[in-house]
Amino acid sequence: MNFTLKVLGTASALPTTERYPSAQVLDVRGRLFMIDCGEGAQMQLRRAGVSFLKIEHICLSHIHGDHLFGLFGLLSTMGVLGRSSDLNIYAPPSFRGVLDFFMANFGDGIKFGINLVELNMKEPERVYESRTAELLAFPMNHRIKTFGFIIREKMPPYNVHKEAISRYGLSLTEIGTLKRGEDVLRPGGTVIPNGEAAYIPYQPRSYAYCSDTAPFPELAEWIKGVDLLYHEATFPAEMFEMAVKTFHSTTLQAAQTARDAGVGRLLVGHYSSRFPSVDFYLDELKTVFPNTELAHDLDEFEIPLLKN
């Protein structure tokens, strides 16, 4: 029942010897979602122990090179490894032409299907769902069309208290009703409240990815209450004007979004190459949102399962 984020790259436009460009993998119960795929992603995937062939979904936030130049080598390697299962890619509409060019010129060895889902929404919209999880995309505020993502578990079926089964003499049909979250209404008008006889076994977990973006009013509401938020913090607070000019965020802006959204934890990255060390970012961030961590390449973050 793991829900584990592996951070592969934390650089912004210019990679450094310590930071690869943006790329992450979220493992949701063994189903792998890759988010952005900057240059060198294959090497980082190997270092992180992630199987290329187990990646089912790749989410591309926008068509800037530091977020996707690693994709084409990864697709080619998947072909060399004999991948046969389909790969789902979620990206802005302009990516279709890029993918078509790549496939026409370099795609001979790629025998698996690529399902491209074009992102063009103006508010959060579900773009994928399975029995246990769903993926939502929503617009960011960047220089070009850019999207953030939420990956979250679905609400599990209710469990029925064993004591309630014996006390009420529940039938299989009534147990099924309670597991769907509904009250039981018996002939004659007797009601068995769901809240009395059943319970949610655990709290669904959620993760939001917001990069690249400048702040905007709707964002906090869209990501409200997620367990873990990754938000770009390209610049320290003193470089506010540069952040405005480039449509990025400062440390304080990222922390303010986390605070306003009431998230569980804040994780920041996408650091400017101007700073060999960004340890000083943490002091700025924690003045606004104390439960903040700096992401580093190859860090792992687990969202634990909280049972009720």
Residue ranges of model-derived segments:
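Active-site neighborhood of divalent metal-dependent phosphoester bond hydrolases
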Residues: 83-87, 92-120
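Conserved beta-strand hairpin/beta-sheet module of binuclear metal-dependent hydrolase folds
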Residues: 1-48, 84-86, 149-151, 199-210, ...
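General small-molecule cofactor/ligand-binding pocket signal
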Residues: 6, 90, 115-120, 136-138, ...
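Short acidic, glycine/proline-enriched helix-loop-strand junctions
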Residues: 87, 276-299
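Metal-dependent phosphodiesterase/nuclease catalytic metal-binding core
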Residues: 120-268, 279-283, 288, 304-308
